[in-house]
Amino acid sequence: VIYQSAERVRGRNYPATNGFFKVCVISHLRPEKDPLRTAMAARRLPSSSRVRVLHIGRPLSDAMARQVRAETARNPRFCWLGELSHARTRQVLANSQLLSVTSRMEGSSNALSEAIASSVPVVASKISGLMGTLGRDYPGYFPVGQTGALTQLLDKIESNPDFYRRLKAHCARLRPLVEPKRERAAWRELLAELE
C-alpha cells in the first residue's frame, strides 16, 4: 500500500477553554462527499457547545450552491469559507481541533493525510478507503450518513478531553505512514518491481 504523503504544518490545534472548538471540513460540495453532514450534526449539539464548522470547498453544482447558502443562513455554527489556496487550507486545518471526513465513498483523502501530518485528529465515516488509513479500531468513526451518530461523536470529543487525547494519540501514531520520504520509497520499490 502506498499512502499519500503530506508535509507537516504547525498550528494551534489544542482546544482553547474560552474559544471555539473548530471542526474543519475540506471538500468540494458534491453528493458523494456528503459535504453538509457535519453542519447538520452541529445544529443538533447542545446550546453550550463551542463547535464551529469551518467548511473549505466550492460547490460543483447550482443545487449544492443553494444548499450551502441555505445552511450558512440557518446555522450559526457553520462558516463556509469557499475555495481557498492550498496553503491557506492547510493553515486553517492546522489551527482546527478536528477534521471531519463525511464521504459516502472514496479512497483515502488528501485532507486525511494532511490532518495526520499536522496532528489534527479526525472523525470519519466508516468506509473502507478511510479505514485503510485510520485502521479498523479507530474510535472516531460514525456510520455513513448518520447525522445523529456524528452529533453524538462530536459532543463526546468536545466534552471529553480524555477521548479527544485518545483520537489525537491514535493519529499521531499514524504520522509515519504519511511522511513524504516513506511515499517516495514505496514508489521507488514499486517501480523497481515493474522493471
Label each residue range with its predicted role.
Residues 1-12:
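Short beta-strand->alpha-helix junction loop in the catalytic core
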Residues 15-33, 38-43, 53-56:
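Conserved donor-binding/catalytic core segment of Leloir-type glycosyltransferases
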Residues 52-77, 81, 88:
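Short, structured helix-loop element that forms part of the nucleotide-activated donor/catalytic region
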Residues 83-84, 91-96:
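Short alpha-helical donor nucleotide-sugar binding micro-motif in glycosyltransferases
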Residues 104:
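Aromatic "clamp/platform" in nucleotide-sugar-dependent glycosyltransferases that forms part
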Residues 121-124:
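Short hydrophobic beta-strand element within catalytic cores of glycosyltransferases
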Residues 136-148, 156-161:
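Conserved acidic donor-binding segment of nucleotide-sugar-dependent glycosyltransferases
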Residues 162-192:
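A charged, aromatic-enriched C-terminal amphipathic alpha-helix characteristic of glycosyltransferases
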